[in-house]
């Protein structure tokens, strides 16, 4: 049976530089992906909340690492700034990319990174670059395909096959997510909970 998460989630802090990162006292699960791929929506679905993580219709709005505490800080959800499109200037983009890199490499309490891929477009070069970087730095990750209700089963199957062939690693799980397909959310939630212990 899937473990249920209710609304016991609190926003801790938005870190905009390395010095402002919170302590490492709890296990953390991070969510990464292109701008507007659905990271905040997935976080809200996982914790059964409509507004814990801010969802924006404008891509590239998240420019800090947002930390959410679950169950009195037994574990945390971490919403990383989207890579790709951004309204920020060049210097600001470099600053938060350096922040993301530092967080992913140096954070000792990071348990897993969930990389979100838009199933409507599949793997883009920027996704591949990010995944290559994770592999190079020995950072464990899973893939979550978002917006699966927007594509046909045939197209979805082709996207999954393409990712499996490209990654060629049986230790990397590929999950599917849609706000309209509840059993898919449950499977992602079950996988998510494996890394919170």
UniProtKB/Swiss-Prot annotation:
Residues 25-197 form the EngB-type G domain. SUPFAM superfamilies: P-loop containing nucleoside triphosphate hydrolases (SSF52540). GO terms for biological process: division septum assembly. Keywords: Cell cycle, Cell division, GTP-binding, Magnesium, Metal-binding, Nucleotide-binding, Septation. GTP binds at residues 33-40, 60-64, 79-82, 146-149, 177-179. Its cofactor is Mg(2+). Mg(2+) binds at residues 40, 62. PROSITE patterns: G_ENGB. One of its GO terms (molecular function) is metal ion binding. InterPro entries: G_ENGB_dom (IPR030393), GTP-bd (IPR006073), GTP-bd_ribosome_bio_YsxC (IPR019987), P-loop_NTPase (IPR027417). Belongs to the TRAFAC class TrmE-Era-EngA-EngB-Septin-like GTPase superfamily. EngB GTPase family. PANTHER family: ENGB-TYPE G DOMAIN-CONTAINING PROTEIN, MSS1/TRME-RELATED GTP-BINDING PROTEIN. Necessary for normal cell division and for the maintenance of normal septation. This is Probable GTP-binding protein EngB. It comes from Wolbachia pipientis wMel.
């Amino acid at each position: 049976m899937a473990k249920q998460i209710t609304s016991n989630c609190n926003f801790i802090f938005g870190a905009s530089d390395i010095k402002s990162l919170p302590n490492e006292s709890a296990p953390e699960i991070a969510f990464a992906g292109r701008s507007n791929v659905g990271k905040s929506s997935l976080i809200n679905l996982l914790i059964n909340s409509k507004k814990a993580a801010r969802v924006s219709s404008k891509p590239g709005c998240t420019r800090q690492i947002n930390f959410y505490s679950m169950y009195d800080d037994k574990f945390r959800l971490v919403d990383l700034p989207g890579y790709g499109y951004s309204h920020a200037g060049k210097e600001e983009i470099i600053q938060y990319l350096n922040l993301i890199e530092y967080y992913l490499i140096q954070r000792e309490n990071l348990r897993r990174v969930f990389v979100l891929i838009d199933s409507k477009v599949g793997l883009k070069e920027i996704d591949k670059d990010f995944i290559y970087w994770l592999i190079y730095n020995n950072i464990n990750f899973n893939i979550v395909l978002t917006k699966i209700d927007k594509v046909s089963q045939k197209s979805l199957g082709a996207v999954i096959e393409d990712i499996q062939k490209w990654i060629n690693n049986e230790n990397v799980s590929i999950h599917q997510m849609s706000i309209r397909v509840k059993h898919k959310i449950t499977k992602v939630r079950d996988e998510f909970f494996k890394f919170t212990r």
